[in-house]
């Protein structure tokens, strides 16, 4: 992980929102580490909403509607799913403080979840923060084939419909790059962020 970081003894929800507005976000070294630190990557992951790409195979699967997609009905359960170890991800950075902070942002109307349901079981989802015309994606999880990918597609559809300008993925992965995510230098990201944050808070 490239980018500056500094220890922060106590982070409040309001402080967290201010941090997002200037390009910072918190992480922990592990789920068991009680400390948080601010991260400000020199290279930022961004998923351009006008260049979002869905593969033919995924589009075909989405048309079959394998899951019911809901928004903001099980926010804390989504964080819990993201915090659990998974194949290829033996540990995560989501500690108890992260859960508490983002649950507070959710109650304040700033943090949101996209959820994939199979009957009454949550089988995938993602969560993030909405501020101005920007959405900051935090994490995702999947217990069924393509569940988190389908949630991402529905997230982008929703952001486009509501005229969001920026989808920040923090970092890029090969998974996100397959959808069109790109690495953006900090100076360019700062301009994109300032433009999006200058907008009134858009309804998610």
UniProtKB/Swiss-Prot annotation:
An annotated GO cellular component of this protein is: cytoplasm
Cite a single GO BP annotation. protein catabolic process
Task: Tell me the compartments it is located in.
Answer: Cytoplasm
Q: What is its main location?
A: cytoplasm
Which reaction(s) does its UniProt entry say it catalyses?
N-terminal L-lysyl-[protein] + L-leucyl-tRNA(Leu) = N-terminal L-leucyl-L-lysyl-[protein] + tRNA(Leu) + H(+); N-terminal L-arginyl-[protein] + L-leucyl-tRNA(Leu) = N-terminal L-leucyl-L-arginyl-[protein] + tRNA(Leu) + H(+); L-phenylalanyl-tRNA(Phe) + an N-terminal L-alpha-aminoacyl-[protein] = an N-terminal L-phenylalanyl-L-alpha-aminoacyl-[protein] + tRNA(Phe)
- Give the signal peptide, or none: none
UniProtKB keywords: Acyltransferase, Cytoplasm, Transferase
Give the domain of life.
Bacteria
Give the Gene Ontology MF terms in alphabetical order. Answer: leucyl-tRNA--protein transferase activity
Question: What EC designation does it have?
Answer: 2.3.2.6
Question: What job does the chain carry out?
Answer: Functions in the N-end rule pathway of protein degradation where it conjugates Leu, Phe and, less efficiently, Met from aminoacyl-tRNAs to the N-termini of proteins containing an N-terminal arginine or lysine.
Similarity section: Belongs to the L/F-transferase family.
Stated name of the protein: Leucyl/phenylalanyl-tRNA--protein transferase
